[in-house]
Regions:
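Conserved nucleotide-sensing/catalytic segment adjacent to the nucleotide-binding pocket
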Residues: 28-82, 87
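ATP-binding Walker
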Residues: 12
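A glycine- and Lys/Arg-enriched "phosphate-lid" helix/loop adjacent to the NTP-binding pocket
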Residues: 87-129
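Walker A/P-loop
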Residues: 15
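P-loop (Walker A) phosphate-binding loop of NTP-binding proteins
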Residues: 9
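NTP-dependent small-molecule kinase module
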Residues: 24, 124-163
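Hydrophobic anchor at the beta1->P-loop junction of P-loop NTPases
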Residues: 6
Length: 163
């Protein structure tokens, strides 16, 4: 486990898991939200985003936290390990709501409310995004170590095992 991606619905616990995994493995952690977003709440271009991701790929070790569905296959080709968070929608909405008002390493600003468009993305994740992710995982299942968490307890148990 040297090149890791952590994917799944926003609010599922990906970032918390990635941070704990980083502490255990000492692999450098990169947040896709921090790559994409600028402090003024705008974002870089897709081309620049792709170039920055490729710069991370060139490193010998990394954990990449985040979805950005357009680039999941690009990251799947480069990683050796995948952690997918497939948690209930209600848990993800609660997780996204609970982080409002808290500083985050992966965002250059403080969220003050749950954006309705973002909440809609979370509500539709299982229907719109997850099937595509599972199809990609099926494609790479013989080449990658794939771990799927259905609860935060499962991710906590995994971290306990690697201590």
């Amino acid at each position: 486990m040297k090149k890791v991606i952590v994917i799944g619905c926003p609010g599922s616990g990906k970032t918390t898991f990635a941070e704990k995994l980083q502490k255990e493995t000492k692999l450098p952690l990169y947040y896709l939200d921090a790559v994409w977003h600028k402090p003024d709440k705008t974002h870089i271009s897709r081309e620049e985003f792709d170039e920055r991701i490729k710069e991370i790929f060139a490193l010998s070790e990394w954990i990449i936290d985040g979805n950005y569905n357009r680039t999941i296959e690009m990251r799947l080709k480069e990683c050796d390990t995948v952690f997918l968070f497939d948690l209930p929608t209600e848990v993800c909405l609660q997780g996204a709501t609970e982080r409002i008002g808290k500083g985050r390493y992966d965002l250059p600003w403080l969220e003050t409310e749950l954006d309705p468009e973002f909440a809609g993305f979370i509500k539709e994740f299982k229907e719109n995004s997850l099937p595509k992710i599972y199809n990609l995982l099926e494609k790479y299942k013989n080449e990658k170590q794939i771990v799927i968490f259905k609860s935060r307890e499962e991710s906590d148990e995994y971290l306990e095992k690697i201590r």
